[in-house]
Amino acid sequence: RRWTAPPRSGLFFSVLLRPGDVPVARWGWLPLLTGVAVATGLARSAGVDTALKWPNDLLVTVGGEERKAGGILAERAGNDGVVIGVGVNVTLRADELPVPQAGSLALANAVSTDRDTLLRAVLRALEDWYGRWRT
């Protein structure tokens, strides 16, 4: 599926993780723990209720119903890494949504839509969850 959004309306980034000595059989958990980290970071920094829909959708509540506001993808990078891609609709208005079941942090009444603040919170949460997973 395609993900489209107007310029500067979302938070879109990739992170290269190198799990090192963690057995490859456990790497399948990386997109899931990233989802938890993204949901945690956004809940803290944007002040919105978040939920995860298996296996990689980030949901927010808009008008009393859950809507997809983001997603997580993972792809193996060589023999020793995994690239995690994250996309979150931050400031999209209702008329900018690609499909009716989509949402954004702004439509979920986020207390902050500053992308720098949101990114820092998500990366801090990812660092925490990734560290726990590695041990």
Short names for language-model regions:
Residues 4-10, 14-135:
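Catalytic beta-strand/loop module used to bind and position nucleotide/cofactor moieties
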